[in-house]
């Protein structure tokens, strides 16, 4: 090999290490798991190849991530009572997005990273408009990703919100239904739509 080829491979390896760092940053840390009274929330992702791949998880602790107090005050100032009421409900809810981009390559991790940022930004706007996450967000994500990714790139996702009483509401976009541990029955149970 020539010196130029060696330098090119070193730059490529450096870029891959850099991408690994970015992908690692997007993975939730234990401190990111929201706290909901009366519930134990946990999740685990095991990427096929190190940290890079198409599997993705994003927790949504509405209060910590989106400053509900400021949003509620703004909604009340604008006399948007329904938005204010919806925002107050989020204090007792947590959200989780699980997505799976097709494949286990660096490009699939890139699609997952794009989805991560688009999702969190979309939630930000949804809270301003409606005071909660609605199906509009997922319609928009689907449309945008369909128009901007290659034909052979796709993802499935499921978004759920769990409240203090243990009630789970979820939306699935081609993703298998969730499984939850039911203390009453002492086992994991699949939830049907």
What are these regions (language model features)?
Residues 5-193:
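… and, occasionally, acidic/histidine-rich disordered N-termini of signaling adaptors
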């Amino acid at each position: 090999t020539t010196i130029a080829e060696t330098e090119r491979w070193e730059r490529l390896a450096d870029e891959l290490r850099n991408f690994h760092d970015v992908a690692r940053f997007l993975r939730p840390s234990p401190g990111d798991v929201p706290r909901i009274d009366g519930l134990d929330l946990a999740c685990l992702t095991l990427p096929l190849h190190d940290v890079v791949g198409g599997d993705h998880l994003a927790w949504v602790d509405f209060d910590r991530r989106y400053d509900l107090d400021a949003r509620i005050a703004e909604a009340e100032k604008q006399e948007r009572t329904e938005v204010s009421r919806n925002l107050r409900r989020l204090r007792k809810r947590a959200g989780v997005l699980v997505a799976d981009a097709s494949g286990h390559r660096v490009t699939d991790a890139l699609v997952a990273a794009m989805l991560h940022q688009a999702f969190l930004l979309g939630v930000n706007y949804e809270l301003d408009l409606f005071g909660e996450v609605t199906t509009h967000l997922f319609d928009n994500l689907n449309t945008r990703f369909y128009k901007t990714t290659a034909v052979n790139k796709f993802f499935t996702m499921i978004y759920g919100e769990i409240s203090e009483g243990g009630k789970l509401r979820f939306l699935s976009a081609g993703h298998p239904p969730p499984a939850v541990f039911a203390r009453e029955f002492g086992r994991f149970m699949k939830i049907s739509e």
